[in-house]
Swiss-Prot record:
Residues 1-21 are annotated as: Disordered. The keyword Cell division does not apply. GO terms for molecular function: pyruvate dehydrogenase (acetyl-transferring) activity. Its EC number is 1.2.4.1. The gene is pdhA. The pyruvate dehydrogenase complex catalyzes the overall conversion of pyruvate to acetyl-CoA and CO(2). It contains multiple copies of three enzymatic components: pyruvate dehydrogenase (E1), dihydrolipoamide acetyltransferase (E2) and lipoamide dehydrogenase (E3). It catalyses: N(6)-[(R)-lipoyl]-L-lysyl-[protein] + pyruvate + H(+) = N(6)-[(R)-S(8)-acetyldihydrolipoyl]-L-lysyl-[protein] + CO2. It comes from Rhizobium meliloti (strain 1021) (Ensifer meliloti). Heterodimer of an alpha and a beta chain. This is Pyruvate dehydrogenase E1 component subunit alpha. The keyword rRNA-binding does not apply. Its cofactor is thiamine diphosphate. InterPro entries: DH_E1 (IPR001017), PDH_E1_Alpha_Subunit (IPR050642), Pyrv_DH_E1_asu_subgrp-y (IPR017597), THDP-binding (IPR029061). Gene3D superfamilies: 3.40.50.970. NCBIfam families: PDH_E1_alph_y.
Length: 348
C-alpha cells in the first residue's frame, strides 16, 4: 500500500510493457523475473553502500555533510530503467544513490566521500559534489534547489541541438519552495523543454514536515499555473516509478514539454548524519520499514513467484556486500590528492 493514495499517471498504458492498476489506484509496470532481479540488485547496492557510508562517517573517515538515501532507492532505480543513452540526470545533495544508479563505480563514489585521489571528483568535491560527463550525471549540488535551473538548462541544450534526450531534475519537498524552481517551470513550459521534474517528497525538509512548510502540499500540482502536467507516484514501489517514468519520458520525447512527478517516498535516516530525527517517532519509521520497504517488496515478489530462492537472494546480497567492502577498503587506502592539485580544476 502506498504511503498515501497515488494517482495514475494517465489512463494510457506504458509504451514498453502493459500496465495494470494496483490496489492504491496507481499504474504499475509489469516486471519480468529479470526486471525484478535487476531492480533488487541495484536497490540493494544503494542500501548497502549507504549503510557502509554511515559507518565510515561514524569512524571519522568521511568529513563534512553526509546525506543518506536509505529508504528512497526505488525512486532513482525505477526512473533509470526508463532512460536511454544520452539522457541526463541532475540532483541535490542526497546524491550517492543517484550516482550508483547511473552506473558510476562504488569505488569512485566512496573514495570521493573520503576525499581520496581516486574519487570521482578527484577527492575535491566530497559527498555533495560529484560529476560524470561519461555517465551524463551533472551533480550533486549543495545549494538547495540550484540543480533545478541547471537541469532546465540541460533540457534547453537538448532542444537547441535537436536531439531527443531528456533531462531529469531531482529535488526535494523542501527545495520545491525555492523561487528558482518556478522560474525554471516558466521557462520550461514556455519553450516546451524536455525535462522531468522529480519531487522526492520524503515528508521532511530537514526537520520540518511538509504540512508546516507548504501551503500546497500536493507538489505534483505546483506547475499547474504554467500548464505543466503533474502526477503523484508511489515512490516506494519500483514498478509504479517505472510506469510513471515510461510515460513521462514519452511525454518529453514527443515534444510536449516538461512534466512533474511527485514521488511519495520516505527516508529512514535523519536529514544528514548529524540529525537525530527527533521530530518523528520510532513507530512511524518502523511502520514505513515494515509495510512499504522498496527492497522487501521486490524480495517478496521474487520468492512468492518462485523466481528466486532465499539462498539465491543471499548470494546476491553477498556479492553486493563484497562490492561495497571493496569500495570502503579502497576509500581508506587510496592516497589523498597531492597539495599541488589544490588549484587545479578550479574555475576562476
Amino acid at each position: 500500500m502506498a504511503p498515501r493514495k497515488s494517482a495514475s499517471v494517465s489512463s494510457r498504458k506504458t509504451a514498453a510493457k502493459p500496465a495494470k492498476k494496483d490496489f492504491a489506484g496507481g499504474t504499475i509496470a509489469e516486471f519480468s523475473k529479470e526486471d525484478d532481479l535487476k531492480a533488487y540488485r541495484e536497490m540493494l547496492l544503494i542500501r548497502r553502500f549507504e549503510e557502509k557510508a554511515g559507518q565510515l562517517y561514524g569512524m571519522g573517515f568521511i568529513g563534512g555533510f553526509c546525506h543518506l538515501y536509505i529508504g528512497q532507492e526505488a525512486v532513482v532505480v525505477g526512473m533509470q530503467l526508463a532512460l536511454k543513452e544520452g539522457d541526463q540526470v541532475i540532483t541535490g545533495y542526497r546524491d550517492h544513490g543517484h550516482m550508483l544508479a547511473c552506473g558510476m563505480s562504488a569505488r569512485g563514489v566512496m573514495a570521493e566521500l573520503t576525499g581520496r585521489r581516486g574519487g570521482l571528483s578527484k577527492g575535491k568535491g566530497g559527498s555533495m559534489h560529484m560529476f560524470s560527463k561519461e555517465k551524463h550525471f551533472y551533480g550533486g549540488h549543495g545549494i538547495v534547489g540550484a540543480q533545478v535551473s541547471l537541469g532546465t538548462g540541460l533540457a534547453f541544450a537538448n532542444r537547441y541541438r535537436g536531439n531527443d534526450n531528456v533531462s531529469l531534475a531531482y529535488f526535494g519537498d523542501g527545495a520545491a519552495n525555492q523561487g528558482q524552481v518556478y522560474e525554471s517551470f516558466n521557462m520550461a513550459a514556455l519553450w516546451k523543454l524536455p525535462v522531468i521534474y522529480i519531487v522526492e517528497n520524503n515528508r521532511y525538509a530537514m526537520g520540518t514536515s511538509v504540512s508546516r512548510a507548504s501551503a500546497q502540499t500536493d507538489f505534483s500540482q505546483r506547475g499547474a499555473s504554467f500548464g505543466i502536467p503533474g502526477y503523484q507516484v508511489d515512490g516506494m514501489d519500483v514498478r509504479a516509478v517505472k510506469a510513471a517514468a515510461d510515460e513521462a519520458v514519452e511525454h518529453c520525447r514527443s515534444g510536449k514539454g516538461p512534466i512533474i512527478l511527485e514521488m511519495l517516498t520516505y527516508r529512514y535516516r535523519g536529514h544528514s548524519m548529524s540529525d537525530p530525527a527527533k521530530y518523528r517517532s520510532k513507530d512511524e519509521v518502523q511502520k514505513m520499514r515494515s509495510e512499504h520497504d522498496p527492497i522487501e517488496q521486490v524480495k517478496a515478489r521474487l520468492t512468492d513467484k518462485g523466481w528466486a530462492t532465499e539462498d539465491e537472494l543471499k548470494q546476491i546480497d553477498k556479492e553486493v556486500r563484497d562490492i561495497v567492502a571493496d569500495s570502503a577498503d579502497f576509500a581508506q587506502s587510496d592516497p589523498e590528492p597531492d597539495v599541488s592539485e589544490l588549484y587545479t580544476d578550479i574555475l576562476l
